[in-house]
């Protein structure tokens, strides 16, 4: 009986101590860090396979483990792209802002400005798809206006950029969407005889979205508001503009071959 008890004590001690020793040995073993290039090459393979979720993991690992490494800045620019293609518009926008802040003279800086606007362009697409179906007089379109402003800034800064044609095509849509939205709201106020509010919306289109397809519609709303408010001289001025320009007031932009919410974007250049 004593031998059995002794056996159980020894066996129990072995069961407890041996795993602890193994764990202790493992914890002391050096962790082999993967080389930076391995992470980068892995990210490239994953993006090529459209596995953007996993590519993001590899690129984020470069940022975290090699912040001053050879591929750090390139990984930052490619994170903008990977987030966007993975449908993470907010993360893509933030990554672009970060890149602009940290690398103002980088060869890919134009790409960061471009993608910042593109991310704003697509993140509110749910609102855009509803734009002609519901009363938008109280609907916020700040996202569309932000994208318009960011893409306009990109074209001002980098008119010769390889991404300029892409930005110009999207501005066509944004200009039309914002103008239509403002005039839907203007007509909403007009029907309710809120002429000052309607006038403000229509004038926004004339002043901020010139040469859009909605210019004539905006002028007619302004004329109606002036008439209702008793501003007859101003009304006559608007009538003269309408009469002189007539059918010449059209959208000056060429039609785009891009679909409105195409989830595609160019990758940054390799540097």
What kind of feature is each model-predicted range?
Residues 4-7, 25-271:
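Acidic, polar-rich low-complexity tracts and alpha-helical solenoid repeat scaffolds
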């Amino acid at each position: 009986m004593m031998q059995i008890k002794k056996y159980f004590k020894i066996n129990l001690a072995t069961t407890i101590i041996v795993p602890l020793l193994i764990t202790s040995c493992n914890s002391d073993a050096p962790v082999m860090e993967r080389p930076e290039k391995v992470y980068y090459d892995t990210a490239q393979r994953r993006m090529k396979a459209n596995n953007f979720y996993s590519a993001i993991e590899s690129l984020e690992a470069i940022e975290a483990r090699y912040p001053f490494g050879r591929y750090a800045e390139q990984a930052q620019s490619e994170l903008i792209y990977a987030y966007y293609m993975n449908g993470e518009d907010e993360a893509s926008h933030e990554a672009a802002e970060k890149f602009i802040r940290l690398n103002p003279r980088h060869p890919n800086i134009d790409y960061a400005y471009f993608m910042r606007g593109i991310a704003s362009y697509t993140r509110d697409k749910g609102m855009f798809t509803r734009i002609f179906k519901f009363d938008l007089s109280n609907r916020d379109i700040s996202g569309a206006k932000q994208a318009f402003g960011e893409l306009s800034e990109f074209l001002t800064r980098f008119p010769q950029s390889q991404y300029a044609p892409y930005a110009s095509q999207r501005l066509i849509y944004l200009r039309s969407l914002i103008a239509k939205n403002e005039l839907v709201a203007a007509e909403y106020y007009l029907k309710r005889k809120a002429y000052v509010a309607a006038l403000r919306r229509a004038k926004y289109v004339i002043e901020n979205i010139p040469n859009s397809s909605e210019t004539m519609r905006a002028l007619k709303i302004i004329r109606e508001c002036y008439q209702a408010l008793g501003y007859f001289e101003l009304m006559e001025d608007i009538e003269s503009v309408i009469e002189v320009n007539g059918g010449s007031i059209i959208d000056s932009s060429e039609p785009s071959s891009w679909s409105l919410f195409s989830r595609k974007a160019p990758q940054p250049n390799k540097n």
